[in-house]
């Protein structure tokens, strides 16, 4: 008796959970379809997540750099056994970007602001390379190869493979 009553309650609970009940005249499936996002909304959320991740990475790297540069300076009057010569280095300030970069989504920002430090390209014709120098070297190599293959010297040499025989090609380069 107790078992049948418990079984009925459980089966009724399973029935209610598995059956989609209409709400305000629409089925539950219709409501869930309304929650699907548009492509632009997905892109917006993706860009927002990416900018947040970039901001976190920037903060993390800044904290790392601050931790590296806080070493104590030891005041020693001793001369080190192997003194190193002073290197010609310049100390540039470390900067990872503007402070307001993380506030805006990438679609909202002006892309040209990110690349301020790059020099502007001068529009005009490209300078042509001097004709002849590289091409002449290629021509010489081709002539040497064709002369070497046509002469038949590679068959009488110690090595049987013309690819591995460097002595003949070196000889031809010296002759030309």
UniProtKB/Swiss-Prot annotation:
Record's keyword terms, sorted: Calcium, Cleavage on pair of basic residues, Cytoplasm, Hormone, Nucleus, Secreted, Signal
InterPro entries according to UniProt: PTH-rel, PTH/PTH-rel
Main location: secreted
Leader sequence residues: 1-25
GO cellular component terms attached to this protein's record: cytoplasm; extracellular region; nucleus
Family membership: Belongs to the parathyroid hormone family.
Protein name, entry field: Parathyroid hormone-related protein
Taxonomic source organism: Gallus gallus (Chicken)
């Amino acid at each position: 008796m107790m078992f049948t009553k418990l079984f009925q309650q459980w089966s009724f609970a399973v029935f209610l959970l598995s059956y989609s009940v209409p709400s305000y005249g629409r089925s539950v499936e219709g409501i869930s379809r309304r929650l699907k996002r548009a492509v632009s909304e997905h892109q917006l959320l993706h860009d927002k997540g990416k900018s947040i991740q970039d901001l976190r990475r920037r903060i993390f790297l800044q904290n790392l750099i601050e931790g590296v540069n806080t070493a104590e300076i030891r005041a020693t009057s001793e001369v080190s056994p192997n003194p190193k010569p002073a290197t010609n280095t310049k100390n540039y300030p470390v900067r990872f970007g503007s402070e307001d970069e993380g506030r805006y989504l990438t679609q909202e920002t002006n892309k040209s602001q990110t690349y301020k430090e790059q020099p502007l390209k001068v529009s005009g014709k490209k300078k042509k390379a001097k004709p002849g120098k590289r091409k002449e070297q290629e021509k010489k190599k081709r002539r040497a190869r064709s002369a070497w293959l046509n002469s038949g010297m590679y068959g009488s040499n110690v090595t049987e493979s013309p690819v591995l025989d460097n002595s003949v090609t070196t000889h031809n380069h010296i002759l030309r």
